[in-house]
Amino acid sequence: MMAGMKIQLVCMLLLAFSSWSLCSDSEEEMKALEADFLTNMHTSKISKAHVPSWKMTLLNVCSLVNNLNSPAEETGEVHEEELVARRKLPTALDGFSLEAMLTIYQLHKICHSRAFQHWELIQEDILDTGNDKNGKEEVIKRKIPYILKRQLYENKPRRPYILKRDSYYY
């Protein structure tokens, strides 16, 4: 009887370790997929004039995922009819709702990852440079003639400032 309990205990331990390893593999796989997705998105060349539509769509999807909890729900101003309709939906679409919830959770994790937030800031900077471009060009236009003038007209050797000015320096 003792041997039977030891065998059952060993089987339970093997089952537990295998399930833990499967969970860690799936988490590592998710992290790898997220990293690949974000590096491909970040390393692709970004045009300053035109932002690719899929990147803007991803930004829109992230804003939609972030706005799932509307302000009306947070303050408690939701009508009872809407709550009843929402309660009936998961029971009718059981398998689909679980898959949709998992997809929304994965999108939520991707949208809140640090790499994506960094890419989003870069994207906003690129979109804002179109507005600030005129101001930067004015600054450059003021500096360029001075630099060109200094480079073009410095053909003669510089006069040492320590020595006295005499006629032979002119």
Swiss-Prot record:
It comes from the Eukaryota. InterPro entries: NeurotensiN (IPR008055). One of its GO terms (biological process) is positive regulation of phosphatidylinositol 3-kinase/protein kinase B signal transduction. The record marks 160-162 as: Cleavage. Residues 1-23 form the signal peptide. The modification Pyrrolidone carboxylic acid is found at residue 151. Pfam families: Pro-NT_NN (PF07421). GO terms for molecular function: neuropeptide hormone activity; neuropeptide receptor binding; receptor ligand activity. The keyword 4Fe-4S does not apply. GO terms for cellular component: axon terminus; extracellular region; intracellular membrane-bounded organelle; transport vesicle. It is found in: Secreted; Cytoplasmic vesicle, Secretory vesicle. Keywords: Cleavage on pair of basic residues, Cytoplasmic vesicle, Pyrrolidone carboxylic acid, Secreted, Signal, Vasoactive. Interacts with NTSR1. Interacts with SORT1. Interacts with SORL1. Belongs to the neurotensin family. Neurotensin may play an endocrine or paracrine role in the regulation of fat metabolism. It causes contraction of smooth muscle. PANTHER family: NEUROTENSIN/NEUROMEDIN N, NEUROTENSIN_NEUROMEDIN N. This is Neurotensin/neuromedin N. It comes from Homo sapiens. The lineage of its organism: Eukaryota, Metazoa, Chordata, Craniata, Vertebrata. The gene is NTS.
